[in-house]
A protein has these predicted regions:
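Catalytic pocket-lining loop regions of alpha/beta-barrel enzymes
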Residues: 67-68, 73, 81-190
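Active-site gating/metal-coordination segments in enzymes
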Residues: 7-8, 16-109, 113, 171
Length: 246
């Protein structure tokens, strides 16, 4: 991060299927944030299938100061995003706790790759419709969901959601930043790389080379991230953000 001029980052958990691994990983994420409070905003890993235990873990990590939840990975954790009996209580809990929620979404077309999964943009849109007050981040450009925001009824449901750019290199031309910023607003795009899978430096250079207006670039590279987790995150510099996945 220092080498690439990155002031702060979201440290996201992995979507473990074993709740005990989630608990262990969360202990680590709590420790990271406590050691480097100006550099990292940690997001908890949760197994929704754990039911009441998952909700108890949410309360625990919120009490420890973690700033979000995710990345949920339905395809790897054994449930579907439209399993409402499983997801509704968890999303309601994150909303009540004031925690943003990051969810892995897959493209329904295109090439296959390890970890792609089958989490559809349709289910993502339906989830957002069911929880209009939740702060949801659809990872990996939402599996192409922002392009459907040209449909007014889709845009209306998604107006409070965010998209992160993790793994763009493997999915889209980098013009996707400009296109989504124009269609959906730069205020809803979060810079993310999927580090350490992709290195931050080259990714950041490509984004800066796009010629985005400076206000839009500042929103994408950090201002949106700070607003998402709240002003209590005293990120060093408060200008540049990144998505760091451990």
């Amino acid at each position: 991060m220092d080498r690439n001029g990155i002031d702060g980052a979201f440290a996201l958990g992995f979507g473990w299927s074993d709740p005990s691994l989630c608990h262990m990983h969360n202990d680590y994420l709590i420790d990271v944030q406590r050691q480097y409070p100006e550099r990292f905003a940690s997001f908890a890993t949760i197994q929704p299938l754990a039911g009441d235990s998952a909700l108890a873990e949410l309360s625990r990590v919120a009490g420890a100061g973690l700033r979000g939840v995710g990345e949920l990975m339905p395809h790897g954790q054994g449930y579907r995003l439209d399993d409402w009996d499983i997801l509704d209580p968890l999303v309601d809990c994150t909303t009540a706790l004031g925690l943003p929620l990051v969810i892995h979404i897959s493209e329904p077309v295109g090439h296959n790759y390890q970890g792609k999964g089958d989490v559809s943009p349709i289910a993502a849109w339906q989830l957002a419709a069911r929880h209009p007050h939740a702060r949801i981040v659809f990872a990996h450009w939402g599996g192409g969901l922002p392009f459907y925001e040209l449909m007014p009824e889709v845009a209306n449901v998604l107006r409070s959601t965010y998209y992160d750019s993790a793994a763009t290199t493997y999915l889209y031309r980098f013009e996707v930043f400009k296109i989504v910023a124009e269609m959906c607003s730069a205020d809803r795009v979060l810079f993310g790389t999927d580090y350490p899978l992709l290195k931050q430096g080259p990714f950041l250079q490509k984004v800066r080379a796009l010629g985005l207006p400076e206000p839009a670039l500042n929103r994408i590279l950090g201002e949106n991230a700070v607003e998402l987790v709240g002003p209590s995150w005293q990120c060093r510099g408060r200008a540049t953000g990144s998505d760091t996945r451990f």
